């Protein structure tokens, strides 16, 4: 049974998520750090100035998503923050990068995960609440230094469906003393009518906003464009990188056969829903897509989710079913009620 969580304070004020596991953070150092990443990421990194924050993917040669990452450019290094949270996942990420780190490349990799505690602020008041933490001399950039150590990533819009996520700021606080700083931040969030979000609450907020995530939506089965992230995460003007040819061909010569859409449960559950789950056309039971995320949303009035749905079935209002008789309906993203 899914737990219903009311995320309205996060959508109207702010939500604070204190990570139970620190998000992986890797630094790339050395004179060739930008050119090294330029040949791996689908995002343009070369020539970016310090303070720049970008989002991109590390792709397979067939342009399928292997890893996502926020990329923060600092004066002395480039920070990579993939959506990974365990030592094993970090080791796999580093192993992938090292495959392309040739002998003469003047670049080194280092884990910075253990030095920090991570947290996230979401909602329209996220920036106002985070500002007291910023170094007053820090530039107005996507990557901000914090006055007592650490830094913040101010995410731009996440995806074509949600160009303004209402504010999403990732914080990295030095592990020593992080507890007191986070407690002070939590007090400010609550005093302004916001809320603290646990892992389930942040997942509900994410799905309501229509934000695709690793591994549910972003994995080796999909291209960036299918998730609606090519505008945010892909540069079509840069030079060669792993997976470039299929990405470019899809953009200029092809068309999507499936894309990410919102899903609403139509009626009560007939059976328990496990993920991922095949979705069928309600009129003839042919394969129509795959349900990837499902949450119980107070804001949206019931269970909502995300799904990759095939062309011909992805229009809003399209009825779909699963193999157990549960009925769903395609919905526009984001899934929040229209004002």
Name the predicted role of every residue range.
Residues 1-68:
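Acidic, proline/glycine-enriched N-terminal capping motif
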Residues 15-18, 24-25, 70-212:
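Acidic, low-complexity central loop/insert segments
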Residues 27-33, 40, 121-126, 264-272:
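Short, surface-exposed ligand-recognition loops at beta-strand->loop->(often short) alpha-helix junctions
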Residues 30, 80, 121-123, 171, ...:
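Residue-level signal for inorganic ion chemistry
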Residues 40-46, 96-103, 135-136, 185-191, ...:
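Short, solvent-exposed amphipathic alpha-helical segments in soluble enzyme
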Residues 57-58, 127-147, 271-286:
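Short amphipathic alpha-helix segments
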Residues 61, 222, 228-234, 241-244, ...:
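Glycine-rich, small/acidic residue-mixed loop/short-helix segments
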Residues 172-264:
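Anionic-ligand-binding alpha/beta catalytic cores of soluble enzymes and soluble regulatory domains
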